[in-house]
Amino acid sequence: YAVINRMAEDNVVLAQYGYGRTDGADGRVWPWVFNAASHYWSQIAVKMKFMAEKEGGIDKMKGKKIVHLHIDSAYGREPLPAMRKIASDWGVKLVEISIPPPGLEQQSQWLQIRKERPDWVTFWGAGSGMNSTAMTNAARVAFPRDRMMYVTFGAAEEDMYPAGDAAKGTYAVANALPGDDYPLVAAIKEQVYGSGKGNLADESRVGTVYWNRGLGAAVMWIEALKNAQEMHGKVGKAVTGAEFRDGYEALNMTEDRLEEIGIKGMVAPFSISCANHEGAGKFAVMQWDGDKFVQVTGWEEPLDPAFIRKLVEDSAAKFAKENNITPKSCG
């Protein structure tokens, strides 16, 4: 959020791997910003789709109550534009409850939740301390963890372990699934860590959520760089910021390419274009069983991806108008 407006001036790609300002996915207004793979508005739409499936359909969501419990920051409020619109369309009562940073004091918020008696809680926390504190507080007020859905940045093993038994049953979404049996992960484990060249003090973290997410991001950067070198006749040579951006917009991570790299299934297939910098727009739902995350859905997209895209374009257009930005022509 703090540096997004500097990218064009500095000619530097801002790779928001599933985080940051959502309307950065409109490459016409934000040509240097990439949300790939998938942004927060698609994420909240996938979560609400999952809730509807659990409740028996969208028609059963009318009259339901969802609390959006979040850290009081731009990040915590990021999903609200899409969430408010979906809630209004479905007849859902949305209750917004904020937590002052750093988020370790949550008792009053959970007492409010006990009073509200919501059907679901979406949790947008920051840091394992805040994230685990929410689960222990939920347990104290007897709010079921299988009615809580965590943001991607609260969806790691490090967020669950500190809460102990209180974490069991919690749902979370992923843009990169954990596991060390993906061929690339297994190869790194064998060839890098097996030869003593790894930099993790605890090698058991290889294949965890955050580690695999970092691997997914690294793969994307390397593929974008290779694209840039090939497109501009610079194979084996350094590229400029603008050329690297071109490489990003040429990303086409098909199932076949992901399999060739060795991460098929770990991330959703996606492609990028001049106008669309989001990528897959898909997330997988996981549930913590007390020891590990168990995948409970495949790669899910919002019920209406075009609706989410329209929200993105409208928000980006508003920003462009307010800041005298002429959107890039993508042909």
What residues fall within each predicted segment?
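Short, cationic low-complexity segments
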Residues: 299-328
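Extracellular/periplasmic catalytic domains that process cell-envelope and extracellular macromolecules
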Residues: 7-10, 27-28, 60-62, 114-116, ...
